[in-house]
C-alpha cells in the first residue's frame, strides 16, 4: 500500500483529480484477517507444479542426491508449505519442509536429511527464505551487505546455498 500512498500524495501535489485506491494482495498470503490473499492461489499452484517438475528431474538418477529449494517467504511460510501439494508417482515431494514460523535447528536439519536418505535415494527439501535460528537470526544471513529493496526491506538470500554447504560438510 506504500505505492498507493505515494501515488495518491503525488496526484494531490500536482493538483490532479485522480483518486488512487489500493486493493491489498500478496502472493505470500500474509495479510492479517484474510484467509487467502488474491494472488496466493496461483502462486501456490506454481510452487507445487515446480516441485513436481524438480522431482521428475531428480528421481531419474540412481546417484544419491539432496536438492534444496529456497522458496519466497520472509515472514510467512505459506508458499513453502504449498510445496507439500506436489506429488509424483505417489511419492511425497518434498520430503522435508522448513518454514519461517518455526525456529530452525541445524543439528536437527542434518538428522532429518540423514534419516530421509536412509529411506530414499533422492530427497528434495523446501525451505522458506526467512527461516531463523532460535535466537532470531536468519539462517545463512546475507543481509549484512546492507542492500535493500525499494521499500527498505533488506534483501534475504543465501539460505539454500548455506544449507548446501552444511549438508556437504556433514
PLM region spans:
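Accessory alpha-helical/coil subdomains and C-terminal extensions
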Residues: 2-17, 37-170
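Short hydrophobic alpha-helical runs that function as membrane-insertion/retention elements
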Residues: 19-21
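Acidic/polar active-site rim loop that often engages polyanionic ligands
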Residues: 23-36, 62-64
